[in-house]
A protein has these predicted regions:
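The feature captures the beta-strand-to-loop junction immediately N-terminal to the Walker
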Residues: 42-44
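Helix-to-loop junction immediately C-terminal to a conserved catalytic motif
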Residues: 57
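Conserved ABC transporter NBD signature motif
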Residues: 65-73, 81, 222
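Conserved ABC ATPase "signature" region
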Residues: 105, 109, 115-132
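Catalytic Walker B motif of ABC-type/P-loop ATPase nucleotide-binding domains
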Residues: 161-165
């Protein structure tokens, strides 16, 4: 049986530089995600998290470096690369005039699957979306919009799942269900996930790796062993993150 280090990368980011108007916001970032990885992406506002995710998902151009998604180079074949990930952001920017079902159909048509092609589970049912699915998204609360965005991200079970603060607006039951689904997909050995969050204390219990961004660079990272150890002591991980942020601020 192959070790995790022998598995092909689902996401490979090498020397990434990205920003706006020629001004780099994220610089020199390198990381890989393999099947089974769940990455917690941390950082204060303005640390470069959103810029990094926009660059990885092709929403802004790379100014340097490379991004490969499930073996496909983002710059060389952007449309093929984008089929390899599902993205849910907060707040979700969704077409308000469409019903939930129409939006899922739209995403499914882009991804080449059907509107309820979820990974072995009824996501709409699990997230309590069935009573909303035929109603216009304009009528949805922020929490329900987050749910439909997550359901769309999971359509077709793409290899890479990216959640940008999208778990924050969920009610406790929906958040529990989404985390359970993410864990199951990772354990299947065919998927990896990146979860950007400000809820630092939730990371050790969900993620197998974590990265802290500061000033557009990786300031600290944690592996599975370190997260498991931190998870055994309440508050240990939060304290570690705070120390890393303070050290970074002292160097600035």
């Amino acid at each position: 049986m192959a070790s995790s280090s022998d598995l092909a990368d689902i996401l490979a980011v090498r020397g990434l530089v990205a920003g706006y108007g020629g001004r780099p916001v994220a610089s020199g970032i390198g990381m890989t995600l393999k099947p089974g990885d769940i990455l917690g992406l941390l950082g204060a506002n303005g640390s470069g998290k959103s810029t990094l995710l926009k660059a990885i998902t092709g929403q802004i151009r790379l100014e340097g470096g490379s991004v490969t998604i499930d073996g496909v180079d983002l710059a060389g074949a952007p449309e093929r690369a984008k089929v390899g990930f599902g993205l849910a952001i907060d707040p979700p920017d969704l077409p308000a005039a469409l019903t939930g079902r129409q939006y899922l159909q739209l995403v499914a048509s882009i991804r080449g699957c059907v509107e309820d092609d979820w990974p072995g589970v009824d996501i709409a049912g699990r997230l309590g979306l069935r009573r909303w699915i035929e109603r216009p998204i304009a009528e949805y609360s922020l929490g329900t919009r987050a749910k439909i965005a997550i359901a769309a991200a999971l359509l077709g079970a793409p290899p890479l799942l990216i959640f940008d603060e999208s778990l924050n607006g969920l009610d406790p039951l929906a958040a529990f269900e989404v985390k359970r689904i993410i864990r199951a997909l990772a354990l299947s050995g065919r998927h990896a996930a990146s979860i950007s969050t400000h809820v630092v204390e939730a990371v050790p219990g969900l993620c197998t790796r974590a990265v802290l961004l500061a000033d557009g660079r990786i300031a600290r990272d944690w592996d599975a062993r370190q997260l498991a150890e931190a998870n055994r002591t309440p508050g240990a991980f939060e304290a570690d993150v705070m120390r890393a942020l303070e050290a970074q601020a002292a160097e600035a």
